[in-house]
Amino acid sequence: MRSGGRMPESVLLLSGGIDSATLAYTHRPDLTVTVDYGQCCVDAEIQASAQIANQLNLEHEVIEVDCKNLGAGTMAGQQETDLGDAPEWWPYRNQLVITLVAMDVVHRGAHRLLIGAVADDQSHADGKAEFFELMDSLLSFQEGDLRVTAPAIDKTTEEFVREADPPESLLGWTHSCTKSNAACGECRSCKKRQRVLTRVY
């Protein structure tokens, strides 16, 4: 859904997970965007993101670019690769989705792209603080001066949720499974989601 010509100053990459949902609650961006890049759990991500945006009265859009044949690991429905240290590792995934969102919003007046990355999700190189600093430098160097920021990168998910205190009903919409549209309850992301919600609420 397009935002009706409105010029978004701040844009949130909304995956439908706990971290980006909490960031939507704390920062109330002008626009939220979910990217369908061919991941196996995309239907649930889009549904969760739409419900989160609706509850917070935020604009929500979906970008579709099928890159499944370039993916790897459980998120692409394929075998994991030795290059990554987790079964869901997808090469250059965060670089891909950030670039796709940036391409869509930079010419519409956006100046800040918010990413829901946290301290305890830095097992992949593209989840580390250094990565987001490099992406910020890369995008701001180019036309449009779009900045990338990960406001919760120094906090764990549990710390971030406790500090932000979003309503449980909001996080109830979230979907974190990296294997399917129905939460498997067994992958790292499902277990983390359940652990955080149990401890906080």
Language-model features: locations:
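Nucleotide-activated chemistry modules centered on ATP-dependent adenylation/adenylyltransferase
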Residues: 2-201
